[in-house]
Structure formats: structure tokens, C-alpha cells
Amino acid sequence: MSVKLGVAPIAWSNDDMPELGGETTLEQCLKEANEAGYIGIESGGKFPKKSSELIPKLNQFNLKLCSGWYGANLRKNSVEEEKKSIQEQLNLFKDCDAPCIVFAEVSGSIQGDPNRKLSTRPQMERDEWQKFCEKISELGKYLEDEGMPLAYHHHMGTVIETQKDTERLIENTHESVKLTLDTGHMLFAKGDSKYILQNYHERILHVHCKDIRLSLIHI
């Protein structure tokens, strides 16, 4: 198995909190990513949305697009509606030869609201779980057929947050639904990344390796 090492532009600027690195240019981000030795970078808010503009920019700094975030509303949308919503990003990523789309369900998410407690995040009852898994399986098959697999990102403040959520998703979806294992989000949710890796390694397609300040979690 070969592993390629990339980086996310959130290390330079935060799309959710523009005041963090908002003044940092895309060129500085790409230049420093290359200088640090990375061969790939995920997409971000400052990245061009047209491949005719993005590919030359990446080539300028000897970088490849290694994935990028897509926030879905599959709990509310039909699969066909979600296909239409993701199409522009799908086409861009195919043009850039990215390996996957980092996919997360964000309907009802509290991740962007610092005044909300994590305990108020959205959660699904049994019937909705079944429908959600059926829909994401259908979408996963579609994206796999398009050559751009779905790598699901468990994320704090969203409907798939905990280790239990993540296991339930993987165990009840088609094998085309892959996983982005995020060590920071898993630890924040009091989960065990090592367990996920050992037991679901065949579904892991993308990994986010993150540090986390435990002292802040326990405040």
C-alpha cells in the first residue's frame, strides 16, 4: 500500500473563521506547502473553482489536488438533488485528478456556532438512520462509478460525530462509501482512531492527522 502526504489549507486560513488567516494569500499557502515538502493539498475557499485556473496554479508550485471538503444536505435532499449539488465540485475534482471527495453531512450542524453546546448537535432516530444509509449508499455508488469516491468525514457538531456514529455508518452502508479518518475529531469525540483503523481499514481512503489540545477539551 502506498501513502501520499498532503496538507490542508486550513493550516494557513480558516474558511469557517475568516479572521484566522484571512490576509494570507493562496500563493503564500501553496508556496509554503511546497517548501514544507508536501506533494498534495486539499481545496479551500480561496481556491479557484474552475480547473482551467486551478490546475496551472497548482502546477506552479508542484502540487496536486489531494481532495477537499463537501458539505452535504442528504438528510433533506433526495439523492438526485444531492447529485446536482455536488456536480460542480465533482467535475472540478475529476479534471484535477483528485483521489476522492471528503464528504460530510452538515444539515443541522452546529459546527459554526460557538454559542451552541456540543450536546445539541443533530442526531438521528432509527428510521432516519436507515433512510440516510440507503441514500448515502446510492450516492456512494454513483460517485464510485464517476471515479471520484466518497470519503466520509466524521465531524464534531454534525450528525456523524462519535466512534459509535462512524461504526454504524460504515456497517450499514455499501462498500463504496469510504471513510476519512480524522484523528483530531475522533479524539475530541472521545473515540479511538486506532480501533477504527484496525477494524475498518479496508474502508479508510483518506486520513487527517491532527494534534489536539486536551486541556481545552476538558474546559
Label for each model-derived stretch:
Residues S2, K31-E35, K49-S67, E88-A98, ...:
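Acidic (Asp/Glu)-rich catalytic clusters
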Residues K4-A8, C66, C100-V106, E202-R213:
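Non-cysteine beta-strand/loop elements that form the S-adenosyl-L-methionine
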Residues V7, A33, I41, L58, ...:
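Conserved, mostly hydrophobic/aromatic
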Residues A11-T24, L74-E82, R121-E128:
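Active-site mouth loops of central-metabolism enzymes
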Residues P18-E32, E82-L92, A189-L197:
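Short, acidic/polar
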Residues G40-E53, A72-K84, M156-T162, T183-G191:
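Acidic-and-aromatic substrate-binding clefts and catalytic sites of carbohydrate-active enzymes
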Residues V79-L181, F188:
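Active-site acidic/histidine proton-transfer and metal-coordination neighborhood
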Residues I217-I219:
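Conserved small/polar residues in nucleotide/adenosyl-binding loops
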